[in-house]
Amino acid sequence: MKILVLNSGSSSIKFKFFDNKVVKASGLVEKIGEQNSKVILKNVLNNESFERELMINNHEEGLSIVNELFKESGILADLNALDGCGHRIVHGGRNLSEHCLVDDYVLKEIDRVSIFAPLHNPAHLAGIKTMIKAAPSVANVAIFDTAFHRTMPDFAYMYALPYDFYDKHNIRRYGFHGTSHAFVSSRAASLLEKDKSELNVISAHLGNGASVCAIEKGKSVDTSMGFTPLEGLVMGTRCGDLDPAILPFISHLKGLTIEEIDTLMNKKSGVYGICGYNDFRDIEREIEQGNDKARLALDMFCYRLVKYIGSYFAVLPKTDAIIFTGGIGENDSLVRQKVCERLAHLGIELDFELNKQRISGERMINHANSKVKVLVIPTDEELEIARITEELISN
């Protein structure tokens, strides 16, 4: 099957093209709405690139140029030749709890729950509508970051607020990074030679946004992100868990509006708020140069991560493995070491030499005697989206 995967942002479109589950092309439309917009399509098989630089006013114009580059490259005759298009959608809300084929109801519901993800869902919706217009005969599939967490029990996803806030306004914990957690847990089952239905793992997706997921018998039973991706771990620029009473206090102290506080928590906090850096390579370089705030930021990040992983040991009946994924999880040996050392009493023995090896790909980095395996698994959300898209279209 020929499947296109789209991740539409407010001013960009990232895409990958799969032919029979093999990546044939990837690319990006960037700076939509600006004078110096750019479209890049790369033939993954021979590394040949095709580019356009011109003013792109909207997503529709951007996708039209992507179509031109597909034709020029010879990779795809036309977008209408696709069997399906999978769209990454951050938030499905309460009603769209599973991945699904797009119809009028789905479009309206994605729009309705945009209030939960105002930075993401409107752009995703624009991407879907653009694709429908460009290739009316192609099936579109909505893949929700929240869907993997639909199996959380009510006592895990409810907030201890008056019940009406859930019943009437759908305020609950939804969780995110679901496509990534689903992909790496599936790969872990293969690596550990276990059936997914018997797999108990803790998945840590660590990037600029970060979350942990407790997976019991292959299903999500708890996760660190909540109603929004702000809850949970200390992140690149997000504060994570916070005493809610701090918000009105800050508002009175600094005279900030709700919108300004939201920006403060999402874009000016996390490790960046502590030390001025959100790239962990910069943070670790600063630590080597004696920057105490950088040391504090790293310690806070790792400590919160340890607390969440430790709590999920208590949630799961047993734990087969911890999975590290995402840019930091896959590449930062110091973070993995600091976390695993603090969890040693739970049966985790890291092999320090394996951990330090700078190699890509899936690998096991625990000592042979470790009761709990430690896995590094590069995530591939686009491949997972393509797989689900193909599955739903076939059925």
UniProtKB/Swiss-Prot annotation:
Keywords annotated in UniProt: ATP-binding, Cytoplasm, Kinase, Magnesium, Metal-binding, Nucleotide-binding, Transferase
Reaction catalysis annotation: acetate + ATP = acetyl phosphate + ADP
Superkingdom, natural source: Bacteria
Annotated positions for site Transition state stabilizer: 177, 238
Location of this chain's protein in the cell: Cytoplasm
The keyword Cytoplasm belongs to this UniProt entry's keyword annotation: yes
Residues that coordinate or bind Mg(2+): 7, 381
Binding site residues for substrate: 88
Residues given in the record as ATP binding sites: 14, 205-209, 279-281, 327-331
Note accompanying the cofactor annotation: Mg(2+). Can also accept Mn(2+).
Classification via SUPFAM superfamilies: Actin-like ATPase domain
GO BP term (any one): acetate metabolic process
Listed GO MF terms: acetate kinase activity; ATP binding; magnesium ion binding
Pathway recorded for this protein: Metabolic intermediate biosynthesis; acetyl-CoA biosynthesis; acetyl-CoA from acetate: step 1/2
Gene Ontology CC: cytoplasm
InterPro entries: Ac/propionate_kinase (IPR004372), Aliphatic_acid_kin_short-chain (IPR000890), Aliphatic_acid_kinase_CS (IPR023865), ATPase_NBD (IPR043129)
Active site, UniProt feature: 145 (proton donor/acceptor)
E.C. designation(s): 2.7.2.1
Needed co-factor(s): Mg(2+); Mn(2+)
Gene3D superfamilies: 3.30.420.40
Role according to the record: Catalyzes the formation of acetyl phosphate from acetate and ATP. Can also catalyze the reverse reaction.
Subunit structure: Homodimer.
Similarity field: Belongs to the acetokinase family.
Protein name: Acetate kinase
Lineage, top ranks: Bacteria, Pseudomonadati, Campylobacterota, Epsilonproteobacteria, Campylobacterales
